Structures are given as structure tokens and as C-alpha cells.
Amino acid sequence: MKNKMKNIFIVASCFAAITCFSACDDWTEVENVNINTPGIEEQDPAAYAKYLQNLVAYKNSDHKVVYAWFDNSEKTPFSRGQHIADAPDSLDVISMMYPAELADFELADMQTVHAKGTKVVYTISFDKIQKEYTEKVKEGTETGSFDTYLKSEMDKQIGYAGSFDGMITEYKGNNPIYMSAEQKAEAKKYQDIFFSAVLTWKTANADKLLTFQGYPENLIEQTILTNCKHIILATDNVTDDAQLSVFARLAMAAAGVPTDRFVVAVSTASLDASDKQTGFYGTDRALTEAAYWTTEPSDGYTRAGLAIYNVQNDYYNATNTYQYVKEAINIMNPAPKK
């Protein structure tokens, strides 16, 4: 793995030198002129092919994984920062936030990142479905039961899966310890509907990726976690890295939770300069601190990697696109020193 990482970083440095000037222009220029600037793949196809080979081998090796949620709401892109093809090559999994009606450029970008060994998935969130249902009931636009609504939404959203390499299923819910018997039975009923649909899909698509996101300790007699590649803990709103360990301990204390696949969630900094909280632990960047946390030893569970919210925000740095995401990846999976 060390040699593969070394080769990846050497060739990646060459790519950076070729693209750095065009990246700076992204701050002000729109994509209304198609200028065909040869990249390294055209200038030295053999070197690029070797780079891709090493990159794919690295992603198939034992390393700290990196998930990233990408806001693909813009269907007429005016910046390279709106293309997943320009996300860091070392990302393992990119989750598209808007999986329906993918544009042609998005499908092309997906093929580009596939060549780099990156999987492209999307997220189905129980909590989001429940929130939308509650809002529609208040507005008077939904009169049916939540059972029926949930089943319908699962059918619709699982229908997007054909375009993707897998899915992330999010469930936060509430802790059953504090529920009455009636509340617990209702929560389990909804969990059964949600996860049985996911398991049916997974059984028919054994080769596709399934990952859990949320609070595993809130699951009631569910076996979904054994089918999940990773468990992404809902830590994106914590205020310091010590709380990452607390969330991991809470998860591992629950019955039936595999402890060899914990990934912690973190956000990039906001594009709103006045927002000094999103993406920070105090005055420190949460992304950097969480990356260091994954490298520390732990007793009883595995710190498997990071999941990054709003990854596209980090594209817009004056000195280096995706500066802090790349730094975090290098902290977790450093290139070997000579």
C-alpha cells in the first residue's frame, strides 16, 4: 500500500501543476466557453493509466475510508466545483444529495470517478421522510397514514438505485430506552417497513454498497447493520473531537452493533463567512481534528474513517481546491516518507 500511495501522490502532484491555473479562474468565470485544454490523460496516457491502476489498488487496500456528501442541486453548472469529477481522487464514496433526474454531465462525471475506483451512491433518510410527511399533514396535502406514505416513498426512492453503486440508509429516530411500550412498538413497526425494503433491495443487489448512517443504538431488533459496509455515526454537530469517542461508545454499547466499521461524520466550513460554527470545533477546523481522531488507538471499536458533509464547499479555497479535504485524507492515509 505504501508504494501505491507514493505513486499516487507523485503523479497527483503533476496533475495539480497542470490544473492549478484553471482552478483559480473558477472564482469568476462561468462555463460558457468550451476550451479544450489537454490534461495529463491526453499528454501522457501511459502515466495516467498507471496512476488510475495504483489509485484503484489503493482503494481496494486496507485504509481509512472517506465518504462525502455532494450537493448536486445545480443542473446547469457554472463552476468546476459543481462537478464530482473534480472532487479529490482519493474519495472512496460520493453520495449525491439529489439522486432523481440526473443531468447528462452528472452521468458523465460518474463514469469519470468510476475509473478512479470511487463509488457513487445516494442517501435514503427515514427521518427526512417522516419530517416531510408531518409537514404535509399540517398543510393538509397528506391525509393517509404514515405507514402507507413510508412504503410509497421507499418504493420511489429505491427506484433511483439503478443509476448508483449503492445507498446510504439514514435512521436517527429516538432512543427506545425512554419509550413507553406503545411508543416502542410503533417505532419498531416503522423501522420494519423502512429496513425490510432496504434488505429486499440488498438481497437482490448483493454486489452493491450498503452503509448505515445515524444512531445505531436507536434500532429495535434490527439486523440491518450486519449487511452494512460501514456505520456512519451522526457526529456532524458535535463541538469537539472528544465527543466522537462518546458517540462511538454509545453505539458499541447497544446490542448487535458491529464495532469494526465506525465512521464519524463531519462538515466542511460554511461558504458564509459569518458562520464560525459550521465545520469548526471551537476555532479549529473540525475536518482536520476529526481526521487526527481516526488515527488514534481505540479500545473495542475500529475508527474506520470520515464522512464529510458539504464537501463541495471546500473546493473554493484561494490557494488550493479541496485544500482541507485533501489534508484530512493525507492525515489519515499519509504518503510514505523517503
Model regions: which residues?
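Bacterial Sec-dependent N-terminal signal peptides
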Residues: 1-61
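Chitinase-like catalytic core of GlcNAc-active glycosidases
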Residues: 60-251, 257-282, 301-303, 307, ...
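Short glycine-rich, acidic/polar surface loops and turns
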Residues: 289-295
